[in-house]
């Protein structure tokens, strides 16, 4: 099927690899696995194809980990990302493929850099390769600080809801709820 048009004698290790590096592509997000792994669909060679992508420049908590705290926050972050981009038409800036074959991308929704949104909301660490920061250590320290605040009757963060227009923070101060 089509092989009769290829001169296989000219094919060797120097044949270029498929690359979308530097391209901006309009696509639809069809799946969000976790906070930094998504599937998108976009046209290529006249057909629609699904691509596994990793959001470039960030690291989010893992879903498959022994740390219950990290896993819980991982599902929270995944759900926030789903609320933001699942089934949305976005454009992606493409990089290389990572070691797992995923296309490294920076997704944009209505001009908003989703990687930056993840970082600004505390859902992701910046990540440029190499050793990752420990989500488990970060979350344990954060939980310990909250517990210490409880013991000292200081301000305790009870909840934070952020949407496109509002930020609502509930705190408890010496038994009173302040909104």
Regions found by a protein language model. Give the residues of each.
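Small beta-barrel nucleic-acid-binding modules, primarily SNase/OB-fold domains
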Residues: 1-179
């Amino acid at each position: 099927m089509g092989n009769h048009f290829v001169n296989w004698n000219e094919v060797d290790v120097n044949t270029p690899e498929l690359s979308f590096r530097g391209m901006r592509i309009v696509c639809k997000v069809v799946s969000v696995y976790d906070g930094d792994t998504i599937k998108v669909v976009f046209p290529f060679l006249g057909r629609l194809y699904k691509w596994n992508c990793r959001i470039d420049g960030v690291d989010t908590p893992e879903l498959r980990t022994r740390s219950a705290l990290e896993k819980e926050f991982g599902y929270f972050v995944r759900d926030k990302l789903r609320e933001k981009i699942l089934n949305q038409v976005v454009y992606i800036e493409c990089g290389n493929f990572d070691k797992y074959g995923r296309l490294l991308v920076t997704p944009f929704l209505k001009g908003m850099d989703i990687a930056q949104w993840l970082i600004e909301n505390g859902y992701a660490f910046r990540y440029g390769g190499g050793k990752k920061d420990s989500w488990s250590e970060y979350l344990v320290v954060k939980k310990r600080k909250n517990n210490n605040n409880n013991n000292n009757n200081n301000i305790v963060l009870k909840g934070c809801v952020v949407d496109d227009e509002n930020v609502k923070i509930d705190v408890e101060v010496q038994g009173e709820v302040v909104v």
